[in-house]
């Protein structure tokens, strides 16, 4: 299986992304919104990437960005952020949910608030990555406890 092998059994872009992700201080995931959900190809890629890669993702900063004509942004934003939070990754925030609006190519460029949200996100994510790097140098990473697995059916 992918988990046992330490990489995805389907040898494609996921296995190319994993070492880049491992070296990175942060990860930005962006998706259009379809039926209040992220692009299915992206979700499949993220499922495979996060499941098959065994490196420690703790304190890598994550940020999600979504784009929609009108609705479904908050559900999609939440869906993408779950990859970060289950992996111990701090989530960079902005002044609002990280969404921008537009239906046709070029329309999102007219969303002034959305563009401001993206600029704020970029500054906040950069600050957070620099702060974590400085904290690692001065204090190290927080101590990790051994995981205690729990099944809901006993």
Q: How should these model regions be labeled?
A:
Residues 1-7, 104-107:
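N-terminal beta-loop-helix "entrance" segment that forms/cooperates
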Residues 90-154:
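Glycine-rich phosphate/pyrophosphate-binding loop and the adjoining helix
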Residues 3-96:
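Helix-loop-strand module that forms the ligand-binding subsite of alpha/beta enzymes
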């Amino acid at each position: 299986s992918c988990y046992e092998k330490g990489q995805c059994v389907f040898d494609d872009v996921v296995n190319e992304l994993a070492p880049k992700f491992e070296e990175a201080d942060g990860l930005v995931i962006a998706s259009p919104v379809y039926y209040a959900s992220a692009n299915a190809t992206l979700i499949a890629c993220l499922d495979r990437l996060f499941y098959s890669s065994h490196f420690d993702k703790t304190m890598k900063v994550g940020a999600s960005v979504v784009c929609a004509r009108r609705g479904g942004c908050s559900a999609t934003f939440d869906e993408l952020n779950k990859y970060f939070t289950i992996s111990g990754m701090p989530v960079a925030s902005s002044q609002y949910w990280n969404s921008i609006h537009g239906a046709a190519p070029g329309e999102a460029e007219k969303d002034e608030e959305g563009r401001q949200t993206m600029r704020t996100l970029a500054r906040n994510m950069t600050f957070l990555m620099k702060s974590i790097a400085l904290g690692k140098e001065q204090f190290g990473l927080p101590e990790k406890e051994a995981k205690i697995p729990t099944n809901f059916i006993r």
